[in-house]
């Protein structure tokens, strides 16, 4: 779940290709809100050991095992939350929310990302919510926030929420043939963030400037 034009659909495609590589059953279906680019976007991914086990094309109500939340506002919205269920759903969340159209109409608008994350935690249980600022990490470590979503994919993978091997996911990135090295690097940074976010977060801090005075 995320914002259109940022690679949400691509993440679904990568999961589909990785599942195909491993010989698993897979169905993906993409859904967008009123505005596909810049609007709320979802990619439904259904994964099973065999194709015959999949009998629908969308994740059902309270039926999600994992939500990769590339934007907290979209992830915390009704359309996404109603797919979650306490005790079942895990959420890997990018804590940075993109400004919405409300900002144009109200200059005092406050980004509700933290409130959305809190509501998600209430819906599934805080122990099933894992969040970090993937936008800041991608911008600092990769030089462009466009790598936020492959970083989120690596984050969810390292958390053990995706039943696909790392090798298959990396191979899917290679077959996608778009900025392969950077996307693979972003995936690996996401894995590091999942393993030790405080260590990665320290790399995002501005460099300290030392000034020396002449005597």
Model-assigned labels for residue ranges:
Residues 1, 6-215:
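Active-site cofactor/cluster-binding pocket
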């Amino acid at each position: 779940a995320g914002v259109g034009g940022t690679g949400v659909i691509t993440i679904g495609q990568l999961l589909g290709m990785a599942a195909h590589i491993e010989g698993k059953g897979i169905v993906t279906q993409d859904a967008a809100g009123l505005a596909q680019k810049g609007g709320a976007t979802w990619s439904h991914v259904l994964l099973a050991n065999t194709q015959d086990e999949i009998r629908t094309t969308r994740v059902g109500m309270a039926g999600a095992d994992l939500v990769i939340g590339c934007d907290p506002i979209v992830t915390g919205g009704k359309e996404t939350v109603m797919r979650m269920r306490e005790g079942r759903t895990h959420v890997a969340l990018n804590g940075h929310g993109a400004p919405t159209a409300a900002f144009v109409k109200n200059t005092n608008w406050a980004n509700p990302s933290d409130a959305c994350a809190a509501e998600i935690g209430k819906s599934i249980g805080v122990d099933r919510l894992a969040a970090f600022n993937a936008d800041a990490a991608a911008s600092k470590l990769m030089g462009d926030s466009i790598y936020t979503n492959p970083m989120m994919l690596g984050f969810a993978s390292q958390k053990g929420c995706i039943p696909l091997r790392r090798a298959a996911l990396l191979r899917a990135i290679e077959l996608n043939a778009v900025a392969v090295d950077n996307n693979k690097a972003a995936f690996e940074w996401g894995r590091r963030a999942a393993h030790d976010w405080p260590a990665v977060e320290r790399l995002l801090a501005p460099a300290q400037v030392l000034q020396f005075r002449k005597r």
